[in-house]
Swiss-Prot record:
Pfam families: EAL, HDOD
Protein name (database record): Uncharacterized protein YuxH
Organism of derivation: Bacillus subtilis (strain 168)
InterPro entries cross-referenced by the UniProt entry: dGMP_Pdiesterase_EAL/HD-GYP, EAL_dom, EAL_sf, HDOD, RNase_Y/CdgJ
The organism's place on the tree of life at top rank: Bacteria
Domain EAL: 1-209
Domain HDOD: 203-392
Length: 409
């Protein structure tokens, strides 16, 4: 049996990513099996996390992990470094003296504890809830299930305890601002990917240099001298192209004597693809953490689209990278997607998919969105050509590829 893992970022008030919630499921079912299967599931989760690597999944940040009642009393929580893990106690776990004792034990070991979906908790004994609260660090409150008045009541009731309040399923900027005003410190949801209307936002100067180069590369017969000139006038770009050539041609028998020679060895299509990647990486150095996170998601989607296209033997698999890469470009630039598509030298089918036309590129992007949200049941409906195990390996490869790319100097 295989455990599939995805992640969702958690932000602070400065919109910096401070943690990730790890979402995991069994390969075929969305629930854990009976008690006898809990230990097997525990072993699977441990093995999967060790094989993938917590560092790779969370990039050195804390990870939030949901625990069922049985798993709370297993060895799974203590298999992680306390500095890496926040233990989420599910709202349907009965509050008992045994649970309180277990939480006390975990707190002594240095673990942070969070109560998931706090408003949904309906304790039979208020005194037991009070005792449990003395060991809780974080209260997670679901924005989709509560009103603003209900949330404010919770914050007023428990605000004096020094707890951290996390607003989850925050889907819009309006909800995010509301949560900040009401006193929440952490935020989870896709509010950060919602376009904001802000005047003066545009692409960086470097991006326009890349764009100029992309325009030339998109012609039926690009002028190699002009392409060479564009690259040679940018020292960083020249260095990156040569570095990429060296890494992609490990058995290169000849020494590179000029940028033009490097271009001829790589080919226009490969250079064009790499320029798209470099332009996004350059853009990620500017702006705050939420923009950085959007770029990471875009790059992961880009690589995953390409890998899945290769796995399913689609023609021109490298072209599928573009649909993932530009899937959030309107959010990054705070502009209408229609304007952006008109300006960029994109393949017609890719541009149409970005505009919502349900062609094969659009379907691929939808499949990737399902994978990143760990929605494997619907994935099987969209991607019937693909084995779940293979798709998951592609997801992990895309995560690692993005991590290596963003960390490269």
């Amino acid at each position: 049996m295989r455990v599939f893992v995805a992640r969702q970022p958690i932000f602070n008030r400065k919109e910096q990513v401070v943690a990730y919630e790890l979402l995991y499921r069994e390969s075929e079912e969305n629930v854990y099996s009976a008690k006898d299967g809990d230990q097997a599931t525990t072993d699977l989760v441990i093995n999967s996390f060790l094989n993938i690597g917590i560092e790779k999944l969370t990039e050195g940040k804390r990870c939030f992990v949901n625990f069922t009642e049985s798993l709370m009393f297993s060895n799974l929580p203590t298999s992680f470094n306390p500095k890496q893990l926040v233990i989420e106690i599910l709202e349907d776990i009965p509050i008992t003296p045994a649970l309180i004792s277990r939480c006390k034990e975990l707190k002594k070991m240095g673990y942070m504890l969070a109560l998931d979906d706090f408003y949904a908790i309906n304790p039979q004994d208020e005194d037991l809830l009070e005792k449990l609260m003395s060991y809780i660090d974080i209260l997670k409150i679901d924005f989709l299930k509560t009103t603003r008045m209900e949330r404010r009541t919770i914050l007023q009731t428990y605000g004096c305890r020094g707890l951290i309040f996390l607003a989850e399923k925050v889907e819009t900027r309006k909800e995010y601002k509301q949560a900040v005003q009401d006193g929440f410190q952490l935020f989870q949801g896709y509010f950060f990917s919602e376009p904001r209307i802000i005047s003066g936002h545009d692409l960086s100067t470097h991006f326009y240099s890349y764009y100029e180069l992309l325009n030339e590369l998109s012609k039926e017969q690009p002028n190699i001298k002009r392409v060479t000139e564009y690259i040679e006038r940018d020292l960083s770009l020249s260095y990156q192209i040569l570095k990429f050539l060296n890494s992609s041609h490990s058995r290169l028998s000849q020494k590179i004597e000029s940028i033009q020679q490097a271009i001829m060895l790589l080919g226009f299509n490969e250079i064009k693809r790499w320029i798209y990647i470099l332009s996004f990486k350059d853009l990620s150095r500017k702006g705050h953490s939420s923009k950085h996170e959007i770029i990471k998601i875009s790059l992961i989607r880009a690589k995953l689209c390409e890998l899945l296209a290769r796995k399913t033997s689609r023609p021109q698999p490298a072209s599928y990278m573009l649909i993932g890469m530009f899937s959030l470009i309107d959010t990054l630039l705070h502009r209408e997607i229609e304007e952006i598509v008109q300006e960029l030298p994109l393949k017609d089918e890719v541009g149409q998919a970005l505009l919502g036309h349900q062609n094969d590129y659009y379907q691929m992007l939808e499949l990737v969105k399902l994978i990143e949200s760990n929605n494997w049941d619907t994935c099987s409906e969209l991607g019937n050509q693909l084995d779940k195990e293979e798709a998951y390996e592609c997801y992990l490869e895309a995560l690692e590829w993005c991590h290596n790319l963003m960390d490269a100097k």
